[in-house]
């Protein structure tokens, strides 16, 4: 897997961790009194699958997020540096475009030859089918 694909996968991982962290915190956070004028909210007991106490959950979730972010940073650091600056990059892009045009022209020639051959095969097939139908005895 190339570095760009790994970076995309890591971004998806960070997004999933963040999404799950917000969801878990919303689900398991204890109720908070909004104003002294309102009565104290009732305590809720939520059973979680991993049975981690709520005060520990934010620490675990943030540790996972930091770990994923560090992996992302390591992947970014592994990206090759461009040599020669912007001018060299533009020159390389121009070279690649010329090469792409040449390959495109060659592919176009091959496509035209293949279409010509397909027409010939279709004509021969039609002739063969007509010959077979003409040889068939009437009933």
UniProtKB/Swiss-Prot annotation:
Pfam families: Med21. It is found in: Nucleus. Keywords: Activator, Coiled coil, Nucleus, Transcription, Transcription regulation. Disruption phenotype: Embryonic lethal. Its main location: nucleus. GO terms for cellular component: mediator complex; polar nucleus. Residues 43-54 have a biased composition (Low complexity). It comes from the Eukaryota. Residues 28-58 are annotated as: Disordered. Residues 92-132 form a coiled coil. GO terms for biological process: defense response to fungus; regulation of DNA-templated transcription. PANTHER family: MEDIATOR OF RNA POLYMERASE II TRANSCRIPTION SUBUNIT 21, RNA POLYMERASE II HOLOENZYME COMPONENT SRB7. Belongs to the Mediator complex subunit 21 family. Component of the Mediator complex. Interacts with HUB1. Component of the Mediator complex, a coactivator involved in the regulated transcription of nearly all RNA polymerase II-dependent genes. Mediator functions as a bridge to convey information from gene-specific regulatory proteins to the basal RNA polymerase II transcription machinery. Mediator is recruited to promoters by direct interactions with regulatory proteins and serves as a scaffold for the assembly of a functional preinitiation complex with RNA polymerase II and the general transcription factors. Required for embryo development and defense against necrotrophic fungal pathogens. This is Mediator of RNA polymerase II transcription subunit 21. It comes from Arabidopsis thaliana (Mouse-ear cress). The lineage of its organism: Eukaryota, Viridiplantae, Streptophyta, Embryophyta, Tracheophyta. The gene is MED21.
